[in-house]
Amino acid sequence: MGIMTIDGRKVEFTDEKNVLTVIRKAGINIPTLCYHSEVSTFGACRLCTVEDDRGRTFASCSEEPRDGMVIYTNSGRIKKYRKLIVELLLAAHCRDCTTCVKSGECVLQELAHRLGVHNIRFENTREIHEIDTSSPALVRDPNKCILCGDCVRACEELQGIGALGFAFRGTEAMVMPAFNKKLAETNCVNCGQCRVFCPTGAISIKTHMDEAWEAIADPEVRVVAQIAPAVRVAVGDHYGMTKGRSVMGKIVNALHRMGFDEVYDTSFSADLTVMEETAEFLKRIEKGEHLPLLTSCCPAWVKFITDQYKDYIPNLSTCRSPQGMLSAVIKEYFRDPENAKGKKTIMVSVMPCTAKKAEAIRPNSFTKGEQDTDIVITTTELIRMIDNFGIDFATLDPEACDMPFGFGSGGGVIFGVTGGVTEAVLRRLTKNHTKEAMREISECGIRGEDGIKEVTVPYNGMDVKICVASGLANARIVMDWVKNGEKEYHLIEVMACRRGCIMGGGQPTRAGDRTKAARAKGLYNADNTMIIKKSDENPLVLELYDGLLKGREHELLHNDFY
């Protein structure tokens, strides 16, 4: 423990890793463009520069706190310095702020307002670079890049992919894929974490809102939406509501008002996933083949395996993702003339995930050669559509989802958080339906924010070894353990994004630690209020197995990755 003096106030510190953290602990929101606590310190933007009592200036993000330090965060010299930095950044930056997708959420734009940068004294030095729209999920605009390196570090350190890097030097420096390839030509898995970390509009979501509006406007089309579990705990943040609060009912109301004919809950098909994946898992355990079973809900993880661990493709569950299952079932349901009523069905999926856009157009996710999910919009796009329509979201009354695919169990709802798939499978395996049994499963070690969690649970006289990983860098560690024979598991669950879908690449950005924890808590709270906890107790799921799915489970609910 030590004591620093910050702007004349004594501030204690303990294990804070840098001066910046201590300053923020003291209640001073010092500006940064390149600092994120989850990745390595880069120290490139210099906006967090402070001054000490000897007149020395330094970047507070890369300086360790020392007992007795005297720091000034807003001296006249420092204020001029920060303002100059922003001016220089803007001199080489695209200034089409009114039409930029990041407008209103851009950190650079916010800092320009905050620091009083109303004029730029320097000549515009920027070069015009080609915008990369090759990816099915993301758009890369080098004209808006400020070389903060956030995307590079997120891709390399959190995801272990390294699709982006720095090229050239000095004033010619740029962030780009190796050899200036298009993003779609790289090993990018479409997870969108680069977009989450990007403070400007240099990396953004490839939007499909116009396609959704076009479908809604067509009187010959029935527009059906499905809403993923993680979406419901992220939308409310944008409208000033309690962080992590589930606003599913309001989302349903908003979609109905915008013109969606039917609105269903993806937690319903998460229950289908639990049913199918559990059956597949038990079959593999019995035969002792293709273990460990690798979950296949996350398309970024699936692409990671199919690209980089090809020998383990047979280990992937053949189950479609919940998005894929529900889209296939809904399309089949409306093929019945009695249900179709002469209209073509367009399936719109509302997801927290940018990689779902890539999954939707993946040929092996089609049914009989036809695309099941026609349009994927992210949570961020949904918010823009709600705002575009002029809906006062906070005042909406909640509405229930439509039937027969509008209800999921608690096990389906928690799919949105890391460990949720495993917990739902364990609920399915247990014959004990009591609250105590559900609580015991939740406390076995599969919950929490740790990037890698290992648990062993007894089942039918054997110890089932399970690993839960979130973040592809952690997934790589786990797969290398397995590949090298260092560890053995029966089941491995992976979500590409840290903490799971609640922090997906399509979610609203700039979520602090409190927001991250609140989103997970929001899904667990939703689970707590549900009467049905187990997927195999969902009456709508059981009815579907006795009806439309009878004898067609493999056709509609499974695929292969070869």
What residue spans do the PLM features occupy?
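Short glycine-rich or small-residue beta-strand-to-loop segments that form or flank ligand, phosphate
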Residues: 7, 138-141, 226, 494-495
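Charged, low-complexity surface patches
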Residues: 12, 134, 144, 187, ...
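Short strand-turn-strand beta-turns centered on an Asx-Gly dipeptide
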Residues: 6-9, 52-54
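A short N-terminal beta-strand-loop micro-motif at the entrance of redox/enzyme domains
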Residues: 9-15
